[in-house]
């Protein structure tokens, strides 16, 4: 008979697969950058921000912080490698934008310093699992909610233009499923309030995007196409 812990593990594996799909979504953008040998007008911000988010969740899922969330660490570890690859490609082909290279390296250095500081505080200044989980979990939630919320800003543009041109349906749907899976994962066996908080809010935000999409879908001119530079930001939502 399957117990709650096994069910949680299975759902976590499903969440890993879906999250991997989200991490891989910008691959088309970077293939375009590689072929054109130029970053054009694509922004580096989503990928640099996701590096920070992944590092934090990798640490949160380790046994030193949370003993039952190793699947959170595994997918974010994979995501970290993918995002660093994206950033590396961006650095290779942003030669005509020297300030971008300087900014990226500066932000990455700052992120590493912050994560190292969080790790040191957690390991040497905090006592007890609850205190450690609360400290790291709250920080993770702040970053995760911000990343879930950023694509939802497109709702404002949709309402103003009465067009869903800049709100890709498939990404919104996958983000909704992803957040929903991780919300379910957080509720089974042992409630993980920090995975629950950010992904619960993420589920609501993604659902809001889908509702707005269906409200304005018919009023969108069919001949218009989605611009890659607008779509890329929507692929940054993870655990």
Curated annotation (Swiss-Prot):
Pfam families in UniProt: MtN3_slv
Extracellular side: 1-6, 66-69, 125-135, 190-194
Observed phenotype of the null mutant: Dramatically reduced fertility due to a postmeiotic rupture of microspores.
GO cellular component: plasma membrane
GO molecular function, one term: sugar transmembrane transporter activity
Chain ranges on the Cytoplasmic side, renumbered to this chain: 28-44, 91-103, 157-168, 216-239
Membrane-topology descriptor: Multi-pass membrane protein
Swiss-Prot/TrEMBL induction comment: Induced by the pathogenic bacteria P.syringae pv. tomato.
Entry's family note: Belongs to the SWEET sugar transporter family.
Subunit structure of this chain's protein: Forms homooligomers and heterooligomers with SWEET4, SWEET5, SWEET6, SWEET7, SWEET9, SWEET10, SWEET11, SWEET13, SWEET15, SWEET16 and SWEET17.
Name of this chain's protein: Bidirectional sugar transporter SWEET8
Organism: Arabidopsis thaliana
């Amino acid at each position: 008979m399957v117990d709650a812990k096994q069910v949680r593990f299975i759902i976590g594996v499903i969440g890993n697969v879906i999250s991997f799909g989200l991490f891989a979504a910008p691959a088309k953008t970077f293939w375009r950058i590689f072929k054109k040998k130029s970053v054009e007008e694509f922004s580096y911000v989503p990928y640099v921000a996701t590096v920070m988010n992944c590092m934090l969740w990798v640490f949160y899922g380790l046994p030193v912080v949370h003993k039952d969330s190793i699947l959170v660490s595994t997918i974010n570890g994979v995501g970290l490698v993918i995002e660093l690859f994206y950033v590396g490609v961006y650095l290779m082909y942003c030669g005509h934008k020297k300030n971008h290279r300087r900014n990226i390296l500066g932000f990455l250095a700052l992120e590493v310093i912050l994560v190292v500081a969080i790790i040191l505080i957690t390991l040497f200044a905090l006592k007890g699992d609850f205190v450690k989980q609360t400290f790291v979990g709250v920080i993770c939630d702040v970053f995760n909610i911000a990343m879930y919320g950023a694509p939802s800003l497109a709702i404002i543009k949709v309402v103003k233009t009465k067009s869903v041109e800049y709100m890709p349906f498939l990404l919104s749907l996958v983000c909704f499923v992803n957040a929903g899976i991780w919300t379910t994962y957080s509720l089974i066996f042992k409630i993980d309030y920090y995975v629950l908080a950010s992904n619960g809010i993420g589920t609501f935000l993604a659902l809001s995007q889908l509702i707005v999409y269906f409200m304005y879908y018919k009023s969108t001119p069919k001949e218009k196409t989605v611009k890659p530079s607008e779509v890329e930001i929507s692929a940054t939502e993870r655990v």
